[in-house]
Amino acid sequence: MIKFDDKQLNNIVEQDGDKHFFIETWGCQMNEEDSEKLSGMLKSQGYEETENRDEASIVIFNTCCVRENAENKVFGNLGRLKNQKEKNPNLIIALCGCMMQQKGMADEILSRFPYVDIIFGTHNAYKFPEYLHRVQVEGVQVKEIFDKETEIVEGVPIDRKSNVKAFVTIMYGCNNFCTYCVVPYVRGRERSRRPEDIENEIKELVSSGYKEITLLGQNVNSYGKGLEEEITFAQLLRRINEIDGLERLRFMTSHPKDLTLDVVYAIRDCDKLCEQIHLPVQSGSNEILQKMNRHYNKEQYLELAKKIREEIPDVTFSTDIIVGFPGETEEDFEETINLVKEVRYDAAFTFIYSRRNHTPADKMENQIPDDVKHDRFNRLVAAVNEGIVVGNKAAEGKIYEVLVEGTSKNNENKLTGRTRNAKLVNFDGCKEMIGKLVKVKIIEAKSFSLVGEVVE
């Protein structure tokens, strides 16, 4: 563990005039939390965040490389920044995140977009104030990518985007090497934070009024490996459940091969652990699962889901599914559809397979044509949505405890929040309810949300 050196914050040069920054984030919740830390470091030095990129004196793109589409968005946005840089030569453009960690990517960026000022990767984001200082004082272009993961850095300032719920990372990296995935290459090997550091962060959040914590990790079930103190993920959950003032606890992501029954029992037994599990299946075909290097088969996954439902009757499942993986036949795809119907997910992140350089799947034979991928994707989404509608319909007439998160995105006159099992609910109420737990009766089920009314 390394303690963040806050002295480097003192090196950020006071700029004349506007001190606004803009951060655009692509990718997962881990990236979102990384952006909150970048924002925290800048706000510690008097910078203000703006939602208007044209107003910013610092623009940061926190990138993702899980799919080609995310990379193309970065290239497109960089191209549009050229005019802004020409109008304001003092504009500082910084790129970070998983895309930058890929071999040769930083050099490609600087070749195509020479007006970029700072490039850094996933392992050294805590050094951003140092890089910014060098650009401001020395007028140099900074590119620094660490090939290997560093020790975990504690104490980095963080600017939370919500006053009600927060992400807390418990581990970094992944050791699984699924054949389609770049995460182990760009996020490094698994490293776990010390349990006392996690507990202290959560206690500080609770004392500041936060009600819900989501524990993050590429594979939270691997938590504890390599720590001096012997501790499992289930034991960590039970320890956090004892923190006074915490109302709700969630976690993601779980790998089906590593989700043990002691974690299931912890969810069953602990009053603060929410009845919701994100359990990526990726495919319902055993042949495809083997090609993906997932280390479980369809039967094992279904048995695990069945056991979870037996122990936690109100549980909801969400998942990740990829269609169009190399060699996927129509029969393989139909097995995925059948699994989706059997499990009946309450939410799903569905993806068309995207070839990624330097992954084994990219070199596999029988790559699927795009038109076939898109056809299967549309059929998958339809099957998933059918299950979601059934689950939402079953909620009608029931009363749920809802944590009020804020006003609805679609209607500022309505409040929005989630049930313990992660159902999104919109309802009428006063803004004083934000941050509180309220009882809501569901009066209407919509396709992807519920409509309710507050009950006394």
Curated annotation (Swiss-Prot):
Binds 2 [4Fe-4S] clusters. One cluster is coordinated with 3 cysteines and an exchangeable S-adenosyl-L-methionine. Coiled coil: none annotated. It comes from the Bacteria. SMART domains: Elp3. Its EC number is 2.8.4.3. It is an enzyme of class 2 (transferase). The keyword tRNA processing applies. [4Fe-4S] cluster 2 binds at C174, C178, C181. Monomer. Catalyzes the methylthiolation of N6-(dimethylallyl)adenosine (i(6)A), leading to the formation of 2-methylthio-N6-(dimethylallyl)adenosine (ms(2)i(6)A) at position 37 in tRNAs that read codons beginning with uridine. This is tRNA-2-methylthio-N(6)-dimethylallyladenosine synthase. It comes from Clostridium botulinum (strain Eklund 17B / Type B).
